Amino acid sequence: MARKSSLLKRAAIAVVSVIAIYVILNASVSRSLPSSSDLPRQLIREDDDDEGRAPIQPRVRVYMYNLPKRFTYGLIEQHSIARGGIKKPVGDVTTLKYPGHQHMHEWYLFSDLNQPEVDRSGSPIVRVSDPADADLFYVPVFSSLSLIVNAGRPVEAGSGYSDEKMQEGLVEWLEGQEWWRRNAGRDHVIPAGDPNALYRILDRVKNAVLLVSDFGRLRPDQGSFVKDVVIPYSHRVNLFNGEIGVEDRNTLLFFMGNRYRKDGGKVRDLLFQVLEKEDDVTIKHGTQSRENRRAATKGMHTSKFCLNPAGDTPSACRLFDSIVSLCVPLIVSDSIELPFEDVIDYRKFSIFVEANAALQPGFLVQMLRKIKTKKILEYQREMKSVRRYFDYDNPNGAVKEIWRQVSHKLPLIKLMSNRDRRLVLRNLTEPNCSCLCTNQTGLITSI
């Protein structure tokens, strides 16, 4: 009995000893490890205290120049004077309303940055008041409006408004700014939506991020996918508020616009010749006017497909009119560039046809008549899901998406700015543009 008691005592002592050793070692190791508050933030799992939430990305800081009024509101005044809206300059030009036209992005971006930050929820950028804090600089010139101040109106020599003088004045003003000179304009953003906007000074502002409709009038060393942002035109027809369906869309194919265009737009006249005698096809010549916009709205809202040929350059506002009308775009423009293609697959709601094929008699209408109602409804659903991207009035629409695209340019801007400071001499035989090139020169087709 005594022997058994002795064994139990020794076993108990051994267990207590093991427990004591474990406690001592555990305390020692714990003291040698940092707590979670001592670890760098990037080493702590995000979902430990906020499961499921994506890391918050810092907003890009944008400084908007307070340009002289002659580059902003003064252009609204000049436009109104040229059309008899006002007889003489007004005391406060900021009370004037920006006129409606297809390149209104410049007004919407300007207005967005003038809003209080509390009204800009969800924007990928934040406006800063000190240029020293800025990542990017926005130049809010109304360059597209400047082009149409005297559109279709004769101007006597030495009098009236001059778009060329405005451009020269703008670039001289910019080149006088410390922040422009610092990086040769690379970290500046300039709206140039009309293909002819700023044409006189492009070589002096080509380092900047240009907001463009396409690259039809730009040389490779002036504009590129990597450096610049392709933006949508402002739609000129009313948004279609009905449901998807084809019951009230009795026209197969609709087009209303200028029949005669230059360059790639010459395809329009040829399409007229091919299509104007086809049944259930409406194709009309028409220029910009309120009456024609009403007719175009009705036509697009009652058609299954809308023809989108090239204009003077590969792009045209009609594509965006088609999308907001839920009228399936039929695109005949071999070199067209499209906005926001990193988030939008246009093939899901558009039909692309190579120009030579489209000009074959009967080809287009036969192809369209073979498309089943089910497929048209799929196109319409997809258009309805993405059309906010092309609506400048939508709080989560075009303006926010343009700023997102602009913010993505920042890493390249920093790279190129640092690289330019480093390189002293470059022996180049061709222009060095920061462009994304393809080794394919022909048309790329897919079935």
Swiss-Prot record:
Signal peptide, first to last residue: none
Lumenal face of the membrane: 30-447
Membrane topology, record value: Single-pass type II membrane protein
Transmembrane segments: 7-29
Location of this chain's protein in the cell: Golgi apparatus membrane
Residues of this chain annotated as glycosylated in UniProt: 427, 432, 439
Region (Disordered): 32-52
Keyword terms of this UniProt record: Cell wall biogenesis/degradation, Glycoprotein, Glycosyltransferase, Golgi apparatus, Membrane, Signal-anchor, Transferase, Transmembrane, Transmembrane helix
Assembly behavior: Homodimer and heterodimer with ARAD2.
Name of the featured protein: Probable arabinosyltransferase ARAD1
Underlying gene: ARAD1
